[in-house]
Amino acid sequence: MRSYKIFGIKDGGAEEWVTTVSNAADGKQAHNDMKQQGYFDYIRCRDVLGGLRFEYNLATGRKTA
């Protein structure tokens, strides 16, 4: 089973690891949790090899990468 690492970015800083997920439902839950907490500006998902899968601006909901 593939795993994906979820990172948060605050104030344009470095990626901060938040959690690791293995399916879309867990990824959506992490996204919703991070959005509600309001601490991070961006959510970034990377695959097991470190490749960027997506990035969203949590304030606007726009996909940025």
Language model region names:
Residues 1-17:
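Short aromatic-glycine-(Arg/Gly/Cys) micro-motifs in beta-strand/loop hairpins
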Residues 13-19, 51-55:
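Surface-exposed loop/edge segments in extracytoplasmic proteins
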Residues 17-36:
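Short, flexible N-terminal segments of the mature chain
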